[in-house]
Amino acid sequence: MANEEDDVDMKKSINSFGAAGAVIAFLSPLALASAAYSDATYGPFPVTVKGYSGSKTNSVSYTGQIARHVLHDSLKKLASKGDGGGNAANLQAEMMAYFGGSDNNKAIIAPVDKGDFNIKQETLNEISKGKNLSGKSYKGVVNGWPGQMTGAEVLASMIEHAAATKGGFDPVTGYNYPQLISKFAMGAVFYNQAVDNYLDEKLAADNKPNSKPYKDGAHYTGKEHVWDEAFGYWGAAAHSLNLSAKENYEVAKMKNLTAADANGDGMIDLKSEMT
């Protein structure tokens, strides 16, 4: 989730955008409960698709990206659950269900409730159905990892090795697999998708044009959704620009409920208030 910002001028009255990185950014103090949707908040934004006759009123949509952040967080948590080999097969299978996707409605392993920091969603399908990390991983060869593997293959290999360790750490190599899996996924999935897909070829005028819906029946235009998808991979809460750097950090660590709870309902909505 991200911590860099590049100035841009784009649709939703948002004045700056993070460069798809790694750390999570978030939300603002009690005053924001009443002024949560200011000019520095990412949405809501009205539907502008010509001829749209559905019931949707907000064109902002990036729930698939939020689901993948949750898959990443849950996978990182699972990577530390090995007992030294005894549970390796079961743990690997469970980790692969979060990496490769599952037909089951998987529980959110992280983030979860922490003190008065109450998370609204408890299962992945409450955010978005049918999402995975494997299908969005970098498809080229990763030269910096042995074996000439693709991004998805590297992550699958890391998962296999993590499952065989005790607590995710391999004392022979010094590899900390929760950290390796997390940091590699941030680059091979989130950064790669945002920078080398949505903010690259999909910004071409003839690719997902803004004069048409993103796909048939969609309530957002091509370029609206391209930008939303990139923002979603950045991993910031919708009102993160209203926060100081300290508040962003505190929310990422689940230590500042007031800053996180933009609408003041006492719950943290992973779709907009935290990722």
Locate predicted features:
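General helical secondary-structure elements
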Residues: 7-8, 64
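Bacterial N-terminal signal peptides
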Residues: 20-29
